[in-house]
Curated annotation (Swiss-Prot):
Protein name: Uncharacterized protein L491
Biased composition regions of type Basic and acidic residues, renumbered to the chain: 65-74, 122-139
Segments of this protein annotated with the region Disordered: 1-139
Superkingdom assignment: Viruses
Acidic residues composition bias: residue spans: 79-108
Residue ranges crossing the lipid bilayer per the database entry: none
Compositional bias ranges of the Polar residues kind: 1-12
Regions of compositional bias (Low complexity) in chain numbering: 23-55
Pfam families, A to Z: DUF5760
Keywords: Coiled coil
Length: 261
């Protein structure tokens, strides 16, 4: 009897099921061996992988999904304690936040004056300083020439003052001796005509008396007030008041030194 195609197909399917059932039986070799247990080196690789993942996570932008990524990368076998990886995550986030803040502060501090408008202003200021230097060279040269002329006049005055002092000293000595002779001959304040060798009148000389008052000092004011007020406290207040009313005169002048002072 010839077999039909449907029967042949059924036989083939049965054989296939039989083979599949035999292959699905567990064998001795499929049992987990001791070598499959995680070793210390694998733990080290896990820690190195965790440090690498931490450094890569510090460069991510969004912080909202960071915790979820953290849980995905670390399975429960690596971190069986939920609180442990929570603490690890918080420490990492806090350190990254602090580092970013320090970098931002350092950048602002180092670049706060390096903006384009400030650079442009610096360039303009440099250009104006160069122009001022050119003007100042001419002004300084003119000022230098004037100061040299002033120093020439000062030198002449000092030289003439030295000669004049000698003349003044000699004149004073002669004056004292003449007054002694006038007093000796009792000439008094009579005027005397003085002529030169050619009988030309040079001038009229006589003894003259002049009276001047000295400067009003604080002691004089205090003594005068005490004669009237007779109260030391009030006198002190009045003297202080008078002193404050004195006018103050200011003037500017050139002072010359030897150059070392």
């Amino acid at each position: 009897m010839s077999r039909t195609s449907s029967q042949n197909q059924e036989i083939i399917n049965n054989k296939h099921r039989l083979k599949t059932s035999k292959s699905s039986k567990p064998s001795k070799s499929s049992k987990p061996s001791k070598s499959s247990k995680p070793s210390k080196s694998s733990k080290t690789s896990k820690s190195s992988r965790s440090s690498g993942s931490k450094s890569s996570r510090s460069k991510t932008g969004k912080t909202s999904s960071r915790k979820d990524k953290y849980k995905e990368e670390y399975s429960q076998d690596q971190y069986p304690d939920e609180q442990e990886y929570e603490q690890e995550y918080e420490q990492e986030y806090e350190q990254e936040y602090q580092d970013n803040g320090e970098q931002t502060e350092e950048f602002v501090e180092n670049n706060q004056d390096a903006y384009p408008e400030d650079i442009e202003n610096d360039e303009r200021q440099t250009q104006s300083n160069k122009e001022l230097d050119t003007i100042n060279k001419k002004t300084k040269e003119r000022l230098k020439n004037k100061i040299n002329k002033w120093m020439d006049h000062d030198d002449n005055i000092k030289r003439l003052n030295a000669k004049m002092k000698a003349f003044k000293d000699a004149k004073k000595q002669e004056e004292e001796s003449i007054i002694k002779l006038i007093d000796k001959f009792e000439i008094g304040e009579s005027k005397m005509d003085i002529r030169d060798d050619n009988k030309n009148l040079r001038g009229r000389v006589y003894k003259h008396k002049s009276v001047t008052k000295g400067a009003i000092k604080e002691d004089i004011i205090r003594d005068a007030l005490m004669e009237v007020v007779r109260n030391e406290r009030k006198v002190a207040e009045l003297v202080k008041k008078i002193e404050s009313k004195r006018p103050i005169n200011e003037r500017y002048y050139l002072k010359r030194t030897k150059g070392n002072n």
